[in-house]
Amino acid sequence: MTDIQNKNYIIALDQGTTSSRAIIFDRDANVVCTAQREFTQHYPQAGWVEHDPMEIFATQSAVMVEALAQAGLHHDQVAAIGITNQRETTVVWDKVTGRPIYNAIVWQCRRSTEICQQLKRDGHEQYINDTTGLVTDPYFSGTKLKWILDNVEGSRERARNGELLFGTIDSWLIWKFTGGKTHVTDYTNASRTMLFNIHTLEWDAKMLEILDVPREMLPEVKSSSEIYGRTKSGIAIGGIAGDQQAALFGQMCVEAGQAKNTYGTGCFLLMNTGDKAVKSNHGMLTTIACGPRGEVAYALEGAVFNGGSTVQWLRDELKIIADATDTEYFAGKVKDSNGVYLVPAFTGLGAPYWDPYARGALFGLTRGVRVDHIIRAALESIAYQTRDVLDAMQQDSGERLKALRVDGGAVANNFLMQFQADILGTQVERPQMRETTALGAAYLAGLACGFWRSLDELRGKAVIEREFEPQLDEGAKEKLYAGWQKAVSRTRDWEPHEGAE
């Protein structure tokens, strides 16, 4: 093997839901170059979402070549590749031709809803939760895979004969990059399939039987940081993690009680629970994360449905702001929300309420309420919902939140970050490096090949750009939060449905 000292770069491949990206990092974990290409979204029916796996591979290969060319680098200068990916998205391909037998079924796709309903009717819901840490929902790969095997003629038989392979996007990319030599996944991606026992760390025989999935088609499961194989040009592939777990690692949340929140359209919260697979009483997912060396650790995961989308609503539907960045200015013009609470339950409420029948509402309106107050209430709602999830995680895990690391587009909003710290009563840490997902994949690959020697070396590179300290006293904080809880309670069970009074 060429001396690692002569190779001064790591490439992170960030395969997302709408685009494929390549980010080149140097030894100081600085971004040298980025390349990105979008690809086609296919919507064959209402609620169905597909991608073409060949287009995903083509765009991901192209951006890697593009990034190297832009940076003026040769592949010999790259120590390793780390891969992070949209999770749960499901691909089945022919082992000989390397061609998919059907489009990739994307994590957002709801076509396997009826399969999930049948699993519930058959009494499997508790077993699924106990074994896989997941809820019975079309979100996860298992029912998507069953749908393909049920609907593509002869596919189940071919899979039993060892002719077909299954993988999440990481597996598919590695298979293609290694020229069909390597069929692997990592523990974080396996834990999102609904086929994997997160306690024994093996594919679960009963789940395979329930969903009628042939064992022969499944990838080998490995840690998130080791050398899995090499590309045709000889670059080692050394790190794999699902996107949210990669962000958790990129934020250096590797010890129990450390948590990160990604503020996007919704919010993704993950809290590391160390070597304990904590069972949630609040509908959180129990999932696998990356330990200090990329080994198995556990995490609780919760999602807020409407984060940045609440601000988009102010802009696109209400038209009271021209740009999302304006919200910080308007929110700062008033000293508080004047008693206004906005509960953005546009599509129901997620964790910890899980009420699909809740609907959005604006409370506390008086003649003294101005547009500024409503804009401020919209930003505050993102912070309140984050506290809802983090409070539940702390109750489930018994871990006290040390500090909240943040990433995603909305973290540039200083008002939101300060209010988040205030309402949590906990320090919020905003990193200088915003590419935390790609950085996590780069770290995992770098540790695997000796590019970086230890976690301590990486910690030294994690620069916090700004710390937001809580400034509200306990009484004021809890009074505000009690108002939020009251507002949420009034939105519950709004939409008429069977079983409602």
UniProtKB/Swiss-Prot annotation:
Disulfide topology: none
> Could you tell me which pathway this protein works in?
Polyol metabolism; glycerol degradation via glycerol kinase pathway; sn-glycerol 3-phosphate from glycerol: step 1/1
What residues does sn-glycerol 3-phosphate bind to? Answer: 17, 87-88, 139, 243
Gene3D superfamilies documented for this protein = 3.30.420.40
List the CDD domains hit by this protein, alphabetically.
FGGY_EcGK_like
Supply the EC number(s): 2.7.1.30
For the keyword Kinase, the answer is: yes
What is the enzyme's class at the highest EC level? transferase
A single GO BP term for this record reads: glycerol-3-phosphate metabolic process
Any single Pfam family the record assigns to this protein:
FGGY_N
Q: Which reaction does it catalyse?
A: glycerol + ATP = sn-glycerol 3-phosphate + ADP + H(+)
Where is ADP bound in this sequence? Answer: 17, 21, 265, 308, 409, 413
Notes on activation and inhibition: Inhibited by fructose 1,6-bisphosphate (FBP).
Binding of ATP, residues: 17-19, 265, 308, 312, 409
Q: Which UniProt keywords apply?
A: ATP-binding, Glycerol metabolism, Kinase, Nucleotide-binding, Transferase
> By its UniProt entry, which PROSITE patterns does this protein fall under?
FGGY_KINASES_1, FGGY_KINASES_2
**Single Gene Ontology MF annotation:** glycerol kinase activity
Q: Which GO terms describe its cellular component?
A: cytosol
- Binding positions for glycerol per the UniProt entry: 87-88, 139, 243-244
The record's comment on protein family reads: Belongs to the FGGY kinase family.
As for what it does, the entry says: Key enzyme in the regulation of glycerol uptake and metabolism. Catalyzes the phosphorylation of glycerol to yield sn-glycerol 3-phosphate.
Would you tell me the protein name for this molecule? Glycerol kinase
